[in-house]
Regions:
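Conserved G1/Walker A P-loop phosphate-binding module
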Residues: 1-75, 79-81
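Conserved glycine(s) of the Walker
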Residues: 16, 155, 246
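Active-site phosphate-binding and catalytic loops of NTP-dependent enzymes
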Residues: 30-32, 99, 171-175, 198-209
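Catalytic P-loop NTPase motifs of RecA-like helicase/translocase cores
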Residues: 39, 62-64, 96-97, 124-125, ...
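Conserved C-terminal guanine-recognition region of P-loop GTPase G domains, centered on the G4
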Residues: 51, 75-143, 216-218
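Active-site glycine-centered loops adjacent to acidic/histidine catalytic or metal-binding residues
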Residues: 58, 119, 149
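Canonical P-loop GTPase G-domain recognition
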Residues: 113, 122-180
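P-loop NTP-binding site
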Residues: 184-293
Length: 293
């Protein structure tokens, strides 16, 4: 008998969803920073064995959208409810409910298994943890609750084994050697965007999109040309920095991570362009891979 299914991870921003999926997959497929809204897309991470295949789905943190980009991000979360064979609802110690009650109300109405993971228990004491478990048992009575630390890999194997038990009987959805549904250029864009999230403050990181215009792969080196899109001319100057130093730092750090990711030398060219108000432009959002209604 072969088992396979979609295991979709939802939760508020910064609760550890991307860290969890990366831990399960064993590769850094989702970028991770301390900033909210780091994950913008729905990303599949695929784990296959001889008789099973788990398709994990990392999703953007749940927010109440303020503009078209955020609305598109929440559409990715909605789709995670619709095709889940198992839903992982991830919270952190001290957290109370989702930032949007519409999503929270859907959890208790689901017919598929729900695993509620209380993350970051390594930062808590036992009495607080017991209070949290009791609280969530009352709020989501149909969920199985697991205290975990995704960062420390505490209890993640227990959760994974339970997922395997709950998977429906099914053939594999993807080739057994495939790790994700995303193309190489997607990960180039995400790695560059991660460096921008890490090094720039306030609104700048949220006004940025990255597009890879060329990706030329040879036996020993990959030549990459990527464009950092901003919404205003003033943001372009901030991204570039004095004498280009800020952009150079992004390039150096991104190239280092890209070489680790692809396992070969990288020649990376970065450019900055103004794409006015792209976050509210449906055509531009579709161009960057976001669904728009």
């Amino acid at each position: 008998m072969h088992k396979a299914g979609f295991v979709n991870i939802i939760g508020n921003p910064n609760v550890g969803k991307s860290t969890l999926m990366n831990a399960f997959v064993g590769e850094k497929l989702s970028i991770i920073t301390s900033k909210a809204q780091t994950t913008r897309h729905r990303i599949f991470g695929i784990v296959s064995g001889d008789d099973f295949q788990v398709v994990f789905s990392d999703t953007p943190g749940i927010i109440k959208p303020s503009y078209a980009l955020q609305a598109s991000m929440m559409d990715f979360v909605k789709s995670a409810f619709e095709d889940a064979d198992i839903l992982i609802y991830m919270v952190e110690i001290g957290e109370k409910e989702l930032k949007d009650e519409v999503f929270f109300n859907r959890i208790n109405k689901l017919e598929v298994p729900v695993l509620l993971l209380i993350n970051k228990v390594d930062t808590s004491d036992q009495s607080t943890l017991e209070e949290q478990v009791a609280y969530w048992k009352e709020k989501v009575p149909r969920a199985e609750i697991f205290p975990i630390s995704a960062l420390r890999n505490f209890q993640t194997e227990v959760v994974f084994n339970r997922i395997i038990e709950l998977l429906p009987e099914s053939p594999a959805f993807f080739p057994k050697d495939q790790l994700t549904d995303k193309p190489e250029r997607f990960f180039v864009n995400e790695i560059i965007r991660e460096k921008i999230l890490l090094h720039y403050k306030e609104e700048i990181p949220y006004s940025v999109e990255v597009e890879t215009e060329s990706f030329a792969d040879s036996e020993t080196i990959i030549h990459i040309r990527s464009v950092i899109m901003v919404e205003r001319e003033s943001q372009k100057g901030i991204i570039i920095g004095h004498k280009g130093e800020a952009l150079k730092r992004v390039g150096v750090e991104a190239r280092t991570d890209l070489e680790k990711f692809f396992g070969k030398q990288i020649h990376l060219e970065l450019f900055v362009k103004v794409n006015k108000d792209w976050r509210s432009n449906a055509r531009q959002l579709r161009r960057f891979g976001y669904d728009t209604n």
